Amino acid sequence: MKRGDALKILEELKNSPNMIKHELAVGFTMAALYDYFKDKNPPPPDGGFGGPEMTKEDWEITGIMHDADYEITGKSLELHTEETTKKLKEIGASQQIIDAVRGHCDKAPRNSLMAKAVYACDELTGLIVACALVQPEKKLSSVTVESVQKKFKDHSFAKGANRDQIKTCEDQLNISLEEFIALTLKTMQTHASELGL
């Protein structure tokens, strides 16, 4: 499965422009996390990167696919990922990608680093977008790590962003919250034009 296949599935499942931007943000962040782990910790022999054959593109595809059917299933958590799973199976996606996509909404165990990563960065990208939208310019370039940290502590801000889920970066990914925010923000700023921010 290639990145282009993932983007085609988003079209087939009638994703809105804003949802596509969210999925791309998570995809870009997943690719950055792959590089982070490759640099910091070579993959363990048991395939902790999602499987011994998982590539950077696979990590990005997992990020792009994680919410592919969220709108078409009426935002129902019970139905979420079911349509995506069908599409991924039809196209011959790896079981590791399918499990990671399903795992982000508790429909499969998050046993791999890839599954744990998409679970943590899903909510953080949303929080960072919310931080950008309250800036006068509504641009990611105006957002700082410090401003995200401040908003993270303010539970009345972006209430839908699950802080506990974001904080799994610490015990599941062994990345401090500050470093996780910094990596995600930098990645999103690098791709700001593609994210419309």
Where are these regions (language model features)?
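Acidic/His-rich, divalent-metal-binding segments that scaffold phosphate/diphosphate chemistry
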Residues: M1-P42, G50-S76
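Electropositive phosphate-/nucleotide-binding environments in soluble metabolic enzymes
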Residues: G4, I20-L24, E78, S142, ...
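Hydrophobic alpha-helix position signal
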Residues: L10, Y34-F37, T84, L88, ...
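C-terminal binding/interaction regions
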Residues: K14, K139-L140, V145-L195
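Amphipathic alpha-helix face/heptad-repeat signature
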Residues: H22, A117-A120, T184
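Divalent metal-dependent catalytic cores for phosphoryl transfer on phosphate-bearing substrates
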Residues: T55-A158
